[in-house]
Amino acid sequence: MSTKVENILEELKSLNLLEAAELVKQIEETFDVDASAASGGVMMAAPSSAPAASDVEEKTEFDVVLEEVPAPKKIAVLKVVRSLTGLGLKEAKDLVESAPKTLKEGASKDDAEAMKKQLEDAGATVGVK
């Protein structure tokens, strides 16, 4: 692997969840692509190439579930959901109003806890499973 690619990879590893979401959004806009379509193929390829690694991942992957949003806190939670997921206003509003709803699947423990803290600070009830 070239030095340039290694440097980019190291920079990507240092991004937090919000920065990664922003990066994905910018890549989608710049290159006119849809990251959600590409992630399906990557997810299917990973288990076949490293079945031993998937056992380890299962123990470290968590789902962040938006359990409940009190009416007075809906706008604050909506803003946090938009920043965490990169969703548009309507999509984020629909998600918040349809709680309980899974926001993120397969998140690392640190990312899941960070998301939970931000959502709880905004007034939502959040579960990490």
Curated annotation (Swiss-Prot):
Q: What is one term from the GO cellular component aspect held by the record?
A: chloroplast
Coarse class of the protein's main subcellular location:
plastid
State the Gene3D superfamilies in the record: 3.30.1390.10, Single helix bin (1.20.5.710)
Q: Which InterPro entries match?
A: Ribosomal_bL12 (IPR000206), Ribosomal_bL12_C (IPR013823), Ribosomal_bL12_C/ClpS-like (IPR014719), Ribosomal_bL12_oligo (IPR008932), Ribosomal_bL12_oligo_N_sf (IPR036235)
Q: Which Pfam families match?
A: Ribosomal_L12 (PF00542), Ribosomal_L12_N (PF16320)
Q: Specify whether Phosphoprotein is a keyword of the entry.
A: no
Locate the coiled-coil region(s) and give their ranges. Answer: none
One of its GO biological process terms is: translation
- Molecular function in Gene Ontology: mRNA binding; structural constituent of ribosome
> Superkingdom of this entry's organism?
Eukaryota
| Localization per Swiss-Prot or TrEMBL | Plastid, Chloroplast
Q: What subunit structure does UniProt give?
A: Homodimer. Part of the ribosomal stalk of the 50S ribosomal subunit. Forms a multimeric L10(L12)X complex, where L10 forms an elongated spine to which 2 to 4 L12 dimers bind in a sequential fashion. Binds GTP-bound translation factors.
Q: What does this protein do?
A: Forms part of the ribosomal stalk which helps the ribosome interact with GTP-bound translation factors. Is thus essential for accurate translation.
Homology family: Belongs to the bacterial ribosomal protein bL12 family.
Under the heading HAMAP family, the entry gives: Ribosomal_bL12 (MF_00368)
Question: What is the protein's given name?
Answer: Large ribosomal subunit protein bL12c
Source species: Porphyra purpurea (Red seaweed)
